[in-house]
Amino acid sequence: ELGLVGSEMCIRDSPTTIGAFAGIEQGDLYQPYQRLPAHPAHVAAGAVFEDFGAWKRPAYYPQGSEDEEAALAREAKAVRDSVGLLDYSPLGKLEVHGPDAREFLNRVYLNNIQTLKVGGCRYGLMLNEAGIVIDDGVIVCLAEDHFLLHTTSGGATTIHQHLEEWLQCEWVDLEVIVSNSTTQWATMMLSGPQARTVLQKLPCDIDLSREAFRHMQYREGNLCSQPCRILRASFTGEVSVSYTHLTLPTRRFV
């Protein structure tokens, strides 16, 4: 009987709203945003932002009455004809250390990592057990037992977990440590025929000449008196275009 199992006092006239369950986890509070180290500078430049995973990243910078298409066309032409700068800080950066680091990476990447020399870079494809591509990016050999992996911007955490699963559950005999340094380094990509010229105008103790710093090579040094990592890589394959990744400690970059 109803009187034995409950009370009509508990029956509401209307159902509970979904908002009551969600509480403050809605709108801007639903998911915390990650902002770039140079976020205030992008705002000052009039950037229109887009959601890229958890990151707020500039999509384009309109001038005057430009719409999105016009702004993107102007920016693309500037990179083709001269130079452009992209804040690429969300790019995933995982560091792999240990005496078995090279063997470990050779197992998880489709590419041959055994032949990658110190100071060299190589584009890599990461596959799952079914042979399906789950991520890609440039692999840098910092030392014989130290590698820097670049993942897709939204995949750093997922790939980090993927690597840890293999190390902790399958290949427990390998001596390898994986750390996520994505938010520790601000990354800028300088692109276009004048990229090298612009970079050479800044105080830098790295030889940036074409002969000393070739395609798919990596260097460490100081830029504007700050430690930096510089990588030469091309995303188009055009010889006339030089792509340079400038990576600096986040706090110093700000």
Predicted regions and their residues:
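Single conserved hydrophobic/aromatic residue that forms the stacking wall/gate
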Residues: 1-6, 11, 245-254
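A residue-level structural signature of the nucleotidyltransferase/glycosyltransferase Rossmann-like core
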Residues: 2, 93, 187-188
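Acidic, proline/glycine-enriched N-terminal capping motif
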Residues: 8, 12-127, 132-134
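Short capping/connector residues at structural and topological boundaries
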Residues: 60, 66, 84, 91, ...
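Acidic, low-complexity central loop/insert segments
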Residues: 138-242, 246, 251
